[in-house]
């Protein structure tokens, strides 16, 4: 994955990423893929806790910011401060805002301006890119 110009605090070689991640996690997080909607075990997670990056362990979102968007992917209205960064994604003939981990640069999903108030953001995140730790 070389679409991000900066170096991240956590880096691994491609071989190390392949060893650390499952094939599906690698495809989503390192090759900018998308998991099938409705297939994520974290989609219906309602316990209080924290969602973290599978690639590096950085906390990304809390369950207090999660909401049901009806899209089939875990959705949040705000990330933890400094946890994610965004870039413009021009793939598939669309212009979207990609969300990636600010610590390791792994692709997480996209953010859209159609979420609930007050932020009106919908961070649509691939569940395979996250771990959940109950509070």
Mark where each language-model region is.
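A short Gly-Trp-Pro
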Residues: 4, 8-135
